[in-house]
Amino acid sequence: MHLVFLLMKFQMKLNESIRYASILVIDESGNPLGVFTSEQGRQLAAKKGLDLLLINPNADPPVCKIVNYGKYKFELEKKAKAKRKNQSQLKEIQMSYNMEEHDYQVRLSQACKFLKAGDKVKVTLMLKGREMQHLELAQNKMAQFQADVSSLAQLAKPPSQEGRNLSAIFVPKKS
């Protein structure tokens, strides 16, 4: 949301801040009205009770549109919010290969919740101290986890060792 405000603050010129000798004016429905001076463009917008917004300052002549600025700003925010909403996030779940069954079930239910919400899940099995000697037990735990979430997810990145951790990434299955 802050990005939209920054863009509007620094790039969008409105009404009196538009100072060009001539501008191409477009009405609220997108039809070009013609080339006018900045003052004439502001007067056209004022007659309709709307604002004159600079759309493209790099064009020759610069392009301005007659809009209801409050509504226009709201639409931009709505589009930005919808774009953010559709992005999936990477959630991480950390486990140990020798954890108790209840703890494992809690992590499994968290992963299922994330996957149902459409997020990617990174499962990390942490190995401490001498546990590095029992890497096959950690791989077995990861295989068990993969089997348990196979109805909801598919493996995006197979289990790989990263230092003292064994991690894999799961993505939700397409319905």
From Swiss-Prot:
CC annotations in GO: chloroplast; cytosol; membrane
GO BP, sorted A to Z: ribosome disassembly
Pfam families assigned to the protein according to its UniProt record, in alphabetical order: IF3_C (PF00707), IF3_N (PF05198)
Keywords from the UniProt entry: Chloroplast, Initiation factor, Plastid, Protein biosynthesis
GO MF annotation terms: ribosome binding; translation initiation factor activity
Subcellular localization, as worded in the UniProt entry: Plastid, Chloroplast
Subunit structure: Monomer.
Function: IF-3 binds to the 30S ribosomal subunit and shifts the equilibrium between 70S ribosomes and their 50S and 30S subunits in favor of the free subunits, thus enhancing the availability of 30S subunits on which protein synthesis initiation begins.
Similarity remark: Belongs to the IF-3 family.
Stored HAMAP family: IF_3 (MF_00080)
Name assigned to this protein: Translation initiation factor IF-3, chloroplastic
Native source organism of the sequence: Cyanidioschyzon merolae (strain NIES-3377 / 10D)
